[in-house]
Curated annotation (Swiss-Prot):
Homodimer. Heterotetramer of two MnmE and two MnmG subunits. This is tRNA modification GTPase MnmE. Belongs to the TRAFAC class TrmE-Era-EngA-EngB-Septin-like GTPase superfamily. TrmE GTPase family. GO terms for biological process: tRNA methylation; tRNA wobble uridine modification. Disulfide bonds: none annotated. Its cofactor is K(+). It comes from Leptospira interrogans serogroup Icterohaemorrhagiae serovar copenhageni (strain Fiocruz L1-130). It holds the Pfam family TrmE_N. Exhibits a very high intrinsic GTPase hydrolysis rate. Involved in the addition of a carboxymethylaminomethyl (cmnm) group at the wobble position (U34) of certain tRNAs, forming tRNA-cmnm(5)s(2)U34. The gene is mnmE. GO terms for cellular component: cytosol. Mg(2+) binds at residues 234, 255. It is found in: Cytoplasm.
Amino acid sequence: MNDTIAAVSTSSGAGAIGIIRMSGPEALTISSSFLFSKNKFLSPSEILPRTAIQCVFQIGDRKIDQILFFYFKSPNSYTGEDLCEFHFHGNPILLREALDAIFRAGARPAKQGEFSRRAFLNEKLDLTEVEAIGRLISARSRFELELAQKNVFGEVTRFTSNLRSQLISLKAECEAEIDFSTEDLTYESLEERKTRIENVKSLCQTLISKSSSAEKLIQQFRIVLYGEPNTGKSSLMNVLLGKERSIISEIPGTTRDYISEEIFLEGIPVRLVDTAGVRETTDHIEKLGIERSEKEFQSADVRLFLVDVSKKENWKEFINKSRERLEGSILIANKIDILNSSWDRNLFSDVKDLIVLEISCKTKEGISNLLDAIKERTGKLGHSEDYVLLEERQRYHFETIVRCLDKTLHLLKEGAPAEIYIQEINYALAEIGEVNGKVDTEEVLGRIFSKFCVGK
């Protein structure tokens, strides 16, 4: 890291501002050769750290742009090195010209993620925080963004620090027992030691479970609207989307294939699927649509089974015919605004794991209850503070820690001496080092930073 790197750190294309970032031992010297103010180029000694300098970026005698310049002196910068930022007007041609001049002056083009790599190597960030920055940049929903923010501010770092502290304490107790076995000292009982290990293992398992739930939410739940023609599936689709997406018609069979759209529930992306109405038909195209409806319904995370409550008469026959599909679904009794006679929702009391709701797509009655039921049915929609997000690499290491602790417990129960099972504790500690990058992780670093943009 003895050289100086530079890159555009804002997104490509025109914009109000375009930023060039430069980091390394020659960053300030190179920068000063372009900063023109009060009829002269600024010397490095005139440039104060953490101060906004309004000046002209000038190449020789050619003025390029009015800019703001910032200098962050090592080690108090993002990378831990001398770091400079040029804030231009965001024209890509202008930025390219300025960057080429910076390269000619002695900087080299930064590689993907090289600024963050230097921050990691200079211990400004640990590996989990670096990965969180990548997730922060690419987050597709508010939920994912909030989870990434938690990790940027050290959620996983604090967890691994606590985990490491507990395992080191456990290891110290075991080593004392080994080294001073002939001394008249009192140590914790085997049961107490087992309990401590179980507690640490439980912490890891809870973390993994929370991450799995979060990942499921990020990858999108599929909510499928299913039922006979003209039960209001397309109308409900439009109501939930807040726009006219599905074609609505009184003619049965209007929807021939499924239609899907993304909606957000409490900042969490959800895929909403409107399917073709299910009925007996001789139309080949409609049959194909119905087959797809069945497949979508069976693979759904949340199944909304719609019925037109104003027309349905033989409820017992309907229940007997549809029982298998009703189990685990949300039955939506639609069109209650035109219901002429009462209906008995208790008819469904013996259908396993069924929620029954009454709504009107026309008046919007019951829609808020439906949204609540969807959240209840998933059992996972909630606030980001209830979750933590692990990258796949991190999750692998935490799962390995659990296996090490399982083996430790097994050895304890078998009566193995501390000299044997302490090795498993050492393995678990090594895995913690892999999580936050406190070991030699060159290959891992290459994979992580290859996903970053050049200016990061």
